[in-house]
Amino acid sequence: MKTVKVNIVTPDGPVYDADIEMVSVRAESGDLGILPGHIPTVAPLKIGAVRLKKDGQTEMVAVSGGFVEVRPDHVTILAQAAETAEGIDKERAEAARQRAQERLNSQSDDTDIRRAELALQRALNRLDVAGK
């Protein structure tokens, strides 16, 4: 089966590099399914899971925003942060979820609601990818 080269890169360095049959990402405009030979595209990403399918198996990588650049034979994901399922510390992710939820529930005047919502989304995404 045909494959496409996928690189996931953060400011801290590469996170993932493999030949994949299909990539699914959550873009600002909606979900994108990318197969080999896809038309060139650049799209901003939402917080979400990147699904990478190969040989009947699906791997997941949690990404926190960024961009996807698609070429017919190569997909590059430039993410603000990214972690493979194996690399996620579940206890740390759960603690981050609890902190974000507490900030949202506090309703104090100095709470930055948008930042707390984004922190909660990131924590929930990490927990989802890690499989709780």
Swiss-Prot record:
- Keyword Disulfide bond assigned to the entry: answer is no
Check the record and name the Pfam families matching this protein.
Answer: ATP-synt_DE, ATP-synt_DE_N
Topology relative to the lipid bilayer, per the entry, is:
Peripheral membrane protein
Write out the annotated subcellular location. Answer: Cell membrane
State the residue spans of region: Disordered. 88-112
What GO MF terms are annotated?
ATP binding; proton-transporting ATP synthase activity, rotational mechanism
Self-association or partners: how does it assemble?
A: F-type ATPases have 2 components, CF(1) - the catalytic core - and CF(0) - the membrane proton channel. CF(1) has five subunits: alpha(3), beta(3), gamma(1), delta(1), epsilon(1). CF(0) has three main subunits: a, b and c. The F(1)F(0) complex interacts with SpoIIIJ and YqjG; YqgA is found in the same complex.
Q: Which PANTHER family match?
A: ATP SYNTHASE DELTA/EPSILON CHAIN (PTHR13822), ATP SYNTHASE EPSILON CHAIN, CHLOROPLASTIC (PTHR13822:SF10)
Q: What is this protein called?
A: ATP synthase epsilon chain
